[in-house]
């Protein structure tokens, strides 16, 4: 009887973990994004994007994103196959970034993925996201982060 009880508790704990967010950190969000891109699952890719990114890039239109996916798919798949994370940096509890190894980044591409913390976890955004920029400026002003080129 005690063995059954322990087994039941173990199963319950596993079931509880199954409902965890796929976006607990920038690196794990990127992993979720990468799996969705390689698995040709555009709805899951969309879920990795921040609300502001969706608005800025696709006018917050899932239909627009789904129409763009066939055009963007190959480029995104090639990129996620190539990119290797060099650094994960949480600037504070609101923003962070991933820096990719320069040898894995195309010459005309940014070596960074930017992230914002939303209600359901860390989401991909763009450096053009006004909320990201404002949070970054505030982090710099408060000494939470120093821009690499700043003295």
Where are these regions (language model features)?
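Sec-dependent signal peptide recognition
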Residues: 2-9
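Well-ordered beta-strand positions in beta-sheet-rich domains
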Residues: 82, 110-112
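Short, surface-exposed charged micro-motifs
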Residues: 87, 112-114
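Short solvent-exposed beta->alpha transition segments
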Residues: 21-22, 27-32, 37, 42-95, ...
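Low-complexity, intrinsically disordered terminal/linker segments enriched in charged
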Residues: 91-95, 104-110, 118-119, 123-151
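C-terminal motif of bacterial Sec signal peptides marking the signal peptidase cleavage site
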Residues: 13-15
């Amino acid at each position: 009887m005690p063995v059954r009880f322990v087994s039941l508790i173990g199963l319950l704990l596993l079931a509880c973990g199954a409902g965890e967010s796929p976006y607990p950190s920038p690196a794990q969000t990127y992993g979720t994004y990468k799996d969705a891109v390689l698995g040709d699952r555009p709805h899951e890719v969309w879920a990795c994007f921040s609300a502001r990114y969706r608005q800025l890039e696709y006018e917050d239109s899932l239909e627009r994103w789904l129409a763009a996916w066939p055009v963007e798919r190959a480029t995104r798949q090639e990129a996620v196959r190539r990119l290797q994370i060099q650094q994960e940096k949480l600037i504070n509890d609101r923003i962070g970034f991933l820096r990719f190894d320069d040898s894995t980044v195309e010459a005309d591409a940014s070596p960074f993925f930017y992230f914002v913390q939303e209600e359901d976890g860390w989401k991909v955004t763009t450096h053009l996201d006004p909320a990201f920029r404002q949070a970054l400026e505030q982090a710099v002003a408060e000494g939470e982060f120093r821009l690499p080129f700043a003295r």
